[in-house]
Each structure stands twice: as structure tokens, then as C-alpha cells.
Amino acid sequence: MMNVSRPAIHPVDALPVAPTAGAIDRPPVRMKDVQGMPGTTGGLILRLSQFVPALISVSVMVTTSDFRSATAFCCLVLAVSLQSLWSLSLFIIDAYALLVRRSLRNHSVVQCFTIGDGVTSTLTFAAASASAGITVLINDLGQCNVNHCTRFETATAMAFISWFAVSPSFILNFWSLATH
């Protein structure tokens, strides 16, 4: 048999490294906030981009005289009203957090934002889809001269835009919640 060398492990004592001057006073390293998260400028812009189309959708739908004729349109008004109130309240919270330079990366806060975004986005999408179906039906039946088809289409489109703007907020909050 050949004499083959075998690796040997020799433990080496690691000497402790003394902290340098000022390292103790330095705050711990924190990851940067991802833009779009609560308490960031991107989050503030996302909340504003959710609020404005939702407010336009509610305003356009409520100014029509016959939106109560279909349950889907009433549902759209309720869902988008909830979306606009939710987005406005979170816009105010984000603006306050930016003004006082406070982080909103608390687990409970992110969980509340995630659940709220999930509920409001689901309601808005469902109501916008139902309203789109009723609007297409009214168009196909040739009843646009009696109804306000253009207003219904505008309100439905604004609801979809508002839902589309809520999606990044929900995904970022959910991601933050999952990695927290």
C-alpha cells in the first residue's frame, strides 16, 4: 500500500478582535427601506396614486342618476369608497412618518397594512369586474342612449387603475411581512 498523506485538522485559537474607538457608539446597521414600503416616499406616491383614481371613480359614479339601477354599480361605489378612505388614511400616516422621520417597519403595522391592502384590493377588483360586465351588457343590448355608458365605463376604468396601484403596495407589504 502506498503511503498517502491525509489531511489533518489542527484547531487554531481565534484571538478576539477589540472594537475600534467609536464602534460602540455607532447604531447597528439597518437595511434600507425599499421604495413603496410604508413610510417611504415611494409608498406615499403609491398611496396617492391609489386615492386619486378611486376618488374619481366614486365621483363619476355618484353623479349619474341611475347608478342604483344595478347592484354591481352600488357595490362599485361602496368598494371604491372604502378604497379611497383606506388609501387616504395610509397616505396621511405615510406623510406623518416621513415628516417625523419615523420608520413604519413594525411587524404589527406591516401586518395591518397587508391585510387592509389585501381586503380593499380584492373588493375593488371584484366590484370593478362586475361593473365592467354590466357595462358591456348595457352596451350589447343597445341601452346606452337611456343609460350613462360613458360615465359607467370611466368609473369602472378608474376603479381598475386604483386596483392596479394597490397591487404593488400589497405585494411589497406581504413580502416584508414574510421576510420579517
Swiss-Prot record:
Homodimer and heterodimers. The keyword Glycosyltransferase does not apply. Its main location: membrane. Residues 63-72, 139-156 are extracellular. Pfam families: CASP_dom. Belongs to the Casparian strip membrane proteins (CASP) family. The chain crosses the membrane at residues 42-62, 73-93, 118-138, 157-177. PANTHER family: CASP-LIKE PROTEIN 5A1 (PTHR32021:SF1), CASP-LIKE PROTEIN 5B3 (PTHR32021). Residues 1-41, 94-117, 178-180 are cytoplasmic. It is found in: Cell membrane. InterPro entries: CASP_dom, CASPL-5. It is a multi-pass membrane protein. Keywords: Cell membrane, Membrane, Transmembrane, Transmembrane helix. It comes from the Eukaryota. This is CASP-like protein 5A1. GO terms for cellular component: plasma membrane.
